[in-house]
């Protein structure tokens, strides 16, 4: 066991997670069609503050993230402060770590708390796959810059004459890795082939995710942590996530064709997480500040770890790399955990990480560790379903997982929970949470 790194302030305070909330998650171009991520962020932070009745001046910092950024509002965090009635002097900045963005936001606020520069802050993220920054071609962009500098009409017309019809076509945001050109689904296909993960196994995990999520909603387990969203023209509120397939069967999954490797692939739209809109946020405080305000924390942040690996092959192995570090820093092992919540970007990616967490060979030959991190107990794993069912607004998923895990730990009488995710760029994140 390596060095334990307690997350406490100089006064010995633990980092308390006081409350968490999210919007319902909606599939692309459905309930939140036309609602920018900034508005979703304002929606959830405003409601979170209203529910907790925490005075606005108590919050000293807001760290928020957005993966698909809009050029007109590059600092979503500051826009949320200005758009929710928070104190205008509240420090606010934005972060981006792809699918682990709100993990990063939480870590940043925690570091400010430990440094003693603040005593309370908000962390979270929002993304919209329905409101996108549609760009222009590189050639058109260059011509427009040159036209802006041209002095005469003839010079401008000459510049425009260089363009062809194809140069005028809109350019949607890239869905591939900038450095490799590989799509996330291509990487999931790599992982399925590398680790021998079958189509049947992937479909079974996806089906399990939807069943567990549907059950969680039907039993009322998510009611406290998901707000009702009222969307223009305000005819019908959105109360629940709209991606969950409660009545599907395994046979339904088998009907879909591969989405990336059309001839030999096993990754489909059904065993992958969909493009989604939504926002989520959590309030963090020092333990003593929470007591001063008479607040009972949901739980505490025990440890966290971020890792990075090469992007060319099987890059979505973040959980297999970051989990042992987070456990080590928490002074725990896999067997000490009550719950394990892993982001399901793809069923193939999820199953590959589960396999490697229990692999002695991977631990020895790749991580340089004496023993495997530990087998994943199915009874502890994604007990309320995961991202395949709920959806994945990139920057919001981490805050969803943290809030959901802490609520479930409290229902079970407390314990330790692991939340972990892969992210684009070969990045990984893991956090250990504690509830009493």
UniProtKB/Swiss-Prot annotation:
Pathway: Lipid metabolism; fatty acid beta-oxidation
Stored Pfam families: Thiolase_C, Thiolase_N
The keyword Cell membrane appears for this protein: no
Keyword Membrane (UniProt): no
Alphabetical list of InterPro entries matching this protein: Ac-CoA_C-AcTrfase_FadI, Thiolase, Thiolase-like, Thiolase_acyl_enz_int_AS, Thiolase_AS, Thiolase_C, Thiolase_CS, Thiolase_N
The organism's place on the tree of life at top rank: Bacteria
Cellular location(s): Cytoplasm
Record keywords: Acyltransferase, Cytoplasm, Fatty acid metabolism, Lipid degradation, Lipid metabolism, Transferase
Enzyme Commission number(s): 2.3.1.16
GO BP annotations, alphabetical order: fatty acid beta-oxidation
EC class: transferase
Listed GO MF terms: acetyl-CoA C-acyltransferase activity
Active site: 99 (acyl-thioester intermediate), 392 (proton acceptor), 422 (proton acceptor)
GO cellular component terms, semicolon-separated: cytosol
Subunit structure: Heterotetramer of two alpha chains (FadJ) and two beta chains (FadI).
Sequence similarity: Belongs to the thiolase-like superfamily. Thiolase family.
Protein name stated in the entry: 3-ketoacyl-CoA thiolase
């Amino acid at each position: 066991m390596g060095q334990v790194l307690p997350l406490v302030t100089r006064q010995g305070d633990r980092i308390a997670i006081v409350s968490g909330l999210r919007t319902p998650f909606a599939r692309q171009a459905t309930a939140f069609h036309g609602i920018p991520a900034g508005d979703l962020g304002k929606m959830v932070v405003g409601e979170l503050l209203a529910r907790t009745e925490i005075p606005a001046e108590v919050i000293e910092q807001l760290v928020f993230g957005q993966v698909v950024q809009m050029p007109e509002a590059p600092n979503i965090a500051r826009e949320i402060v200005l758009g929710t009635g928070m104190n205008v002097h509240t420090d606010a900045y934005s972060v981006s770590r792809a699918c682990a963005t709100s993990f990063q936001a939480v870590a940043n606020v925690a570091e400010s708390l430990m440094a003693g520069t603040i005593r309370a802050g908000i962390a979270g993220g929002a993304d919209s796959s329905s409101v996108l920054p549609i760009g222009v071609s590189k050639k058109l962009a260059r011509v427009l810059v040159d036209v802006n500098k041209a002095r005469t009409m003839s010079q401008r017309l000459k510049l425009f004459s260089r363009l062809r019809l194809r140069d005028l076509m809109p350019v949607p945001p890239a869905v591939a890795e900038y450095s490799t050109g590989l799509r996330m689904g291509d990487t999931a296909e790599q992982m399925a082939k590398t680790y021998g993960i079958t189509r049947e196994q992937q479909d079974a995990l996806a089906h399990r995710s939807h069943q567990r999520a549907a059950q969680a909603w039907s039993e009322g387990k998510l009611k406290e942590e998901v707000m009702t969203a009222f969307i223009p023209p305000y005819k019908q509120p959105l109360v629940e996530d709209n991606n969950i397939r409660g009545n599907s069967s395994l046979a339904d999954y088998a009907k879909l064709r591969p989405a990336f490797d059309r001839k030999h692939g096993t990754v489909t739209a059904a065993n992958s997480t969909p493009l989604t809109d939504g926002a989520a946020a959590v309030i963090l405080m020092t333990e003593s500040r929470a007591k001063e305000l008479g607040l009972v924390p949901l739980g505490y942040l025990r440890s966290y770890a971020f890792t990075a690996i090469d992007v060319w092959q099987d890059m979505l192995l973040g959980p297999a790399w970051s989990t042992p570090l987070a456990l080590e820093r928490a002074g725990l092992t896999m067997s000490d955990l009550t719950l394990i919540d892993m982001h399901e970007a793809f069923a193939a990616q999820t199953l590959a990480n589960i396999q490697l967490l229990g692999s002695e060979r991977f631990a020895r030959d790749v991580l340089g560790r004496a023993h495997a991190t530990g087998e994943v107990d199915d009874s502890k794993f994604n007990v309320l379903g995961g991202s395949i069912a709920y959806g994945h607004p990139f920057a919001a998923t981490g805050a969803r997982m943290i809030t959901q895990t802490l609520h479930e730990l409290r229902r079970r009488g407390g314990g330790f929970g692991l939340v972990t995710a892969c992210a684009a760029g070969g990045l990984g994140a893991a956090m250990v949470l504690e509830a009493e």
